[in-house]
Amino acid sequence: MRAAVRSTSLALAASLAACAPAARDRGVSPDAPLPARMKVADAGAGRAVFRQCAACHTINEGTGDRDGPNLYGVTRAQVGHNSQRFGYTAALQSVGGRWTCARLDRWLTNPAAFVPGTSMRFPGLRNGLDRADVIAFLYANGGGTPDCR
């Protein structure tokens, strides 16, 4: 009986470890500077993390907005102006400039801290590798190659 419980526990632990973000496998800490995280960023892993975002956002070209704007091409867009149909807050529109890797990283860390007055209710992604993966995924969807030095 103990052997069965032990092997079940080991199998469960191995399964959970396979699902967890593997910072060790990438050789970069989630707290490493953004350029180091972007060197190991994985757009495929970013697609999986983006599922959280898909509750409010779409990503395919030409797809309409939801509670949040469509994000196709956002990495080439001016902050607060990616979708002509979405009603961005004045706070977000006042940021100015374009989305950069650094800006996206700050936004994805804590949107309300980066832009007080934003309507985005998402609390942010704590894991820096998850943020880098999402940034890579956004660049892969209408944004070209990230320049995140």
Region locations from a protein language model:
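C-terminal motif of bacterial Sec signal peptides marking the signal peptidase cleavage site
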Residues: 16-18
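Sequence contexts marking disulfide-bonded cysteines in secreted/extracellular proteins
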Residues: 20, 54-57, 147-149
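The canonical Cys-X-X-Cys-His
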Residues: 46, 50-59, 134-138
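Secreted/processed peptides and extracellular or luminal domains of membrane proteins
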Residues: 25, 59-62
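Gly/Gly-Pro-rich "capping" loops immediately C-terminal to redox-active cysteine motifs
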Residues: 47, 61-98, 122-124
